[in-house]
Amino acid sequence: MDIETANALTAFTARYCDAWHEMNGTWPQSEELYGVPSPCIITTMDDKILWQPQPFSLEQTVNAVERAMDIVVQPAVHAFYTTQFAGDMQARFANETMTLLQTWSENDFQRVQENLIGHLVTQKRLKLAPTLFIATLDSELDVIAVCNLNGEVIKETLGTRKRDVLAPSLADFLNQLEPVL
């Protein structure tokens, strides 16, 4: 596993949870994840849950993606999706506000891998370099992704060759993220 990426993700998650504690006096809350089983759930309330990150309990790889696409996935992406179970987190990098995607549960991990495969299949059809998304933006056409050829974190316009490099590595990117509540 890419320890640098795992540590950067854990550190950002701690910053995010600390910000929730400072602002709200609780662990992060989610209405979207209400009713969705996860080891992260601390408390279920009327229409929301409180969550805290939990250690990832499965094999720490996205091998299903590698097998399906016959590629080797960047080690940083393995670490990103298999370091922890957690809720998605709002974040800011430079002027970009995003939702950092996380694996919520064992079942969610399967769904995440299926979505990554679908993304890669589309890119292959369009003859685009392979990327693996890690965050969504308000614009449904843009995502934050890791280029699988060189490990750079990019802002990518889906279905096009438009890509802007944001950071040389996923660890660098995560270390620069600021929590947004």
Swiss-Prot record:
Keyword rRNA processing among UniProt keywords: no
Gene3D superfamilies found in the cross-reference section: Syd protein
Key word Calcium present: no
Family the entry assigns: Belongs to the Syd family.
Protein's cellular compartments: Cell inner membrane
The protein, known as: Protein Syd
Highest taxon above the source species: Bacteria
One GO cellular component term noted in the UniProt record for this chain: cytoplasmic side of plasma membrane
Topological relation to the membrane, as annotated: Peripheral membrane protein
Keywords: Cell inner membrane, Cell membrane, Membrane
Pfam families: Syd
Biological source species: Enterobacter sp. (strain 638)
InterPro entries: Syd, Syd_sf
Job description of the protein: Interacts with the SecY protein in vivo. May bind preferentially to an uncomplexed state of SecY, thus functioning either as a chelating agent for excess SecY in the cell or as a regulatory factor that negatively controls the translocase function.
Lineage, highest ranks first: Bacteria, Pseudomonadati, Pseudomonadota, Gammaproteobacteria, Enterobacterales
